[in-house]
């Protein structure tokens, strides 16, 4: 059986790990980095992922997608999406089903399609390390992701050619990474996870006893649209406002300028974690009739902290709720673990320290812990890791809409999963022959204030006065936190069951089409790689041939030289095109045309060999002379 890999599919960066000799190992990508920017760029010729995509973003802002995780499983009309529409350099659009999609070069794309490109790079990184094909993965998601977002993440895995064996919550994965080597005792750990686009807090009990370990999530809470990107956006808006005050021009109308501003803001934010002041200097950021304009703004750490103070405060309320749900006080928390790159900000660390009354641990890598935990969970599923039990929870309550537009809960938030629950309902009208089961997720009593996960009908109910028919609704949440619902007429035995798909979301047919598209892209990528290889070989041969022509000098007849130069010109012409086969043919023709050059080079080599042999014979008589070695010996005897 092949390896199951662990993937942290992050908003800003992604990471992949595997078990190697029983230990989780974070893998380096093709660029030699242990984390990969979650950035995907589309050009005329290829799809670029990671650091290379980031490097070209300034020249291709409309078709370079970042922070796509903030859109996954979301509706276009969601307030969180609308906040991003104006500030993103790429176009966010409403799909036919109401989902938030993106547009590149006139093509509409679902967020899972874009995320799949990142997953494919993670898959390839693991395959390069393992030397075998990888088809299975454990993928992490924010603990507070709802059902739609979890489904969309699984869809991304399928499109990337991966069977997602388990969806695991990011804070739980981080706790696994932290606690796997803690052999004895009972610890209650708070995992504060502030990543690029999402925030989670999980309270986890780690019980280690005689080699057996149980990781039990007691409570979780969070905000799926709060993270480092929001911190960046505050600084971006501040810089844009300062420039507008100074120059009277709004950079938000210029995608190219906004891409440069984003990169500069991210860099400045990182610098201000270790220094008190930095300067954002962007020459030629834009231009008007009077000429080019330059942006130069000094930013202090205090200024940045004032811009994001309310964002940091927003993370504290979920901490209070999670502690209350776990029925714990702050003093009962033994350890605090920080996960996610944004936790490197000193002000964030200060807020967490003040809240819990203790310093967070420094021995957990905030960028890699989640991927390490995913790899450990992969090991549990494959049987490589034994004596570890993981008990996760559902982050939000689940129920159905009942009479009066009320949400009736069947499963409360923070219930350990997998779990089942059932309840009997009846009809609202006399002789009602069908009921609509409207499935909801959230904590509000008013049905419309919660997230609609979908609905279906149970038909064929026998006519009867209202309140008499009995319809049993069963909710079943699997280990991925994904919901399956069934409704049964207890009198007739008629049953309707579905795996909940969001009221929007991707259909199986759409996912399958995207899988086929991805496979087609894989063929295109292979062709492009072959083209690049052919061009490189051709360029190398032309360079070497030119050098040999120069070295041959008069030994090369003029007609032979003309033949070789014509063949080189043909290669140069072929490399301008996109036909790898034509380049290879031209390259072969040049090799054949250069046969005379090879003869001249060999003749020269043999002549040099003869001269060297004569020189060796001349010096042979000296070979019998041995240099004497003298050592001075001091006589200590007196």
From Swiss-Prot:
Source domain of life: Bacteria
Phosphothreonine modifications at: 198
Keywords, sorted A to Z: ATP-binding, Chaperone, Nucleotide-binding, Phosphoprotein, Stress response
Keyword Zinc-finger: no
Entry-linked SUPFAM superfamilies: Actin-like ATPase domain, Heat shock protein 70kD (HSP70), peptide-binding domain
Chain residue ranges for the region called Disordered: 602-638
GO molecular function terms attached to this record: ATP binding; ATP-dependent protein folding chaperone; unfolded protein binding
Induction annotation: By stress conditions e.g. heat shock.
Coiled-coil parts of chain: none
CDD domains for the chain: ASKHA_NBD_HSP70_DnaK-like
UniProt entry tagged with the keyword ATP-binding: yes
Biased composition, class Acidic residues, residue ranges: 624-638
PANTHER family from the UniProt entry: HEAT SHOCK PROTEIN 70KDA
HAMAP family in UniProt: DnaK
NCBIfam families: PRK00290.1 (NF001413), PRK05183.1 (NF003520), prok_dnaK (TIGR02350)
Family indicated by similarity: Belongs to the heat shock protein 70 family.
Function: Acts as a chaperone.
Name of this chain's protein: Chaperone protein DnaK
């Amino acid at each position: 059986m092949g390896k199951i890999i662990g993937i942290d599919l992050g908003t800003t960066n992604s990471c992949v790990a595997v078990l190697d000799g029983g230990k989780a190992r974070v893998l380096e990508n093709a660029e030699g980095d242990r984390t990969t920017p979650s950035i995907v760029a589309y050009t005329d010729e290829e799809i670029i992922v990671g650091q290379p995509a980031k490097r070209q973003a300034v020249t291709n802002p409309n078709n370079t997608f970042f922070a796509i995780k903030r859109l996954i499983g979301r509706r276009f009309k969601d307030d969180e999406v609308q906040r991003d529409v104006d500030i993103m350099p790429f176009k966010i659009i409403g799909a036919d089903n109401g989902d938030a999609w993106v547009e590149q070069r006139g093509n509409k794309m679902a967020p899972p399609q874009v995320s799949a490109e990142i997953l494919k790079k993670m898959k390839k990184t693991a395959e390069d390390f393992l030397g075998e094909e990888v088809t299975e993965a454990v993928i992490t998601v924010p603990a507070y992701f709802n059902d739609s977002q979890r489904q969309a993440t699984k869809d991304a895995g399928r499109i990337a050619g991966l069977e997602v064996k388990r969806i695991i919550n990011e804070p739980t994965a981080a706790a696994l990474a932290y606690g796997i080597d803690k052999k004895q005792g009972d610890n209650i750990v708070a995992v504060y996870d502030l990543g690029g686009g999402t925030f989670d807090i999980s309270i986890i009990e780690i019980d280690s006893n005689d080699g057996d370990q149980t990781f039990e999530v007691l409570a979780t809470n969070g905000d799926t649209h709060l993270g480092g990107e929001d911190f960046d956006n505050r600084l971006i808006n501040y810089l844009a406002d300062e420039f507008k005050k100074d120059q009277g021009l709004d950079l938000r109308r210029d995608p190219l300028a906004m891409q440069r501003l984003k990169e500069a803001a991210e860099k400045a934010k990182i610098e201000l974690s270790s220094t008190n002041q930095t300067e954002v200097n962007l020459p030629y950021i834009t231009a008007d009739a009077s000429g080019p304009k330059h942006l130069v703004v000094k930013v202090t750490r205090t200024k940045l902290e004032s811009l994001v103070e309310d964002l940091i405060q927003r993370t504290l309320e979920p901490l209070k709720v999670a502690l209350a749900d776990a029925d714990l006080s702050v003093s009962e928390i033994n350890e605090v673990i920080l996960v996610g790159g944004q936790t490197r900000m000193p002000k964030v660390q200060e807020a967490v320290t003040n809240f819990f009354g203790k310093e967070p641990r420094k021995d957990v890598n905030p960028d890699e812990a989640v991927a390490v935990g995913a790899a450990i969970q992969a090991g549990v599923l494959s049987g490589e890791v034994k004596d570890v039990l993981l008990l996760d929870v559902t982050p939000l309550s689940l129920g159905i809409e009942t009479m009066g537009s009320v949400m009736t809960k069947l499963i409360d938030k923070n219930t350990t999963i997998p779990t089942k629950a059932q309840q009997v309902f009846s009809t609202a009208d006399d002789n009602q022959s069908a009921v609509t089961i409207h499935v909801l997720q959230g904590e509000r009593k008013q049905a419309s204030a919660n997230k609609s996960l979908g609905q279906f009908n149970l038909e064929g109910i026998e006519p009867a006065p209202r309140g008499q028919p009995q319809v049993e609704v069963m909710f079943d949440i699997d280990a991925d936190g994904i919901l399956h619902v069934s409704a049964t007429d207890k009198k007739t035995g008629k049953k309707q069951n579905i795996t909940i798909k969001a009221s929007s979301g991707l259909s199986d047919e759409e996912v399958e089409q995207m899988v086929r598209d991805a496979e087609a892209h894989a063929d295109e990528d292979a062709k492009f790689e072959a083209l690049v290889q052919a061009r490189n070989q051709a360029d190398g041969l032309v360079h070497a041939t030119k050098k040999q022509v120069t070295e041959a000098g008069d030994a090369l007849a003029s007609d032979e030289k003309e033949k070789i130069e014509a063949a080189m010109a043909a290669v140069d012409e072929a490399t301008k095109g996109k036909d790898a086969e034509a380049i290879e043919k031209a390259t072969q023709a040049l090799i054949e045309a250069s046969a005379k050059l090879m003869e001249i080079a060999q003749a020269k080599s043999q002549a040099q060999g003869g001269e060297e042999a004569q020189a060796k014979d001349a010096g042979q008589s000296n070979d019998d002379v041995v240099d004497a070695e003298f050592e001075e010996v001091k006589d200590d005897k007196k």
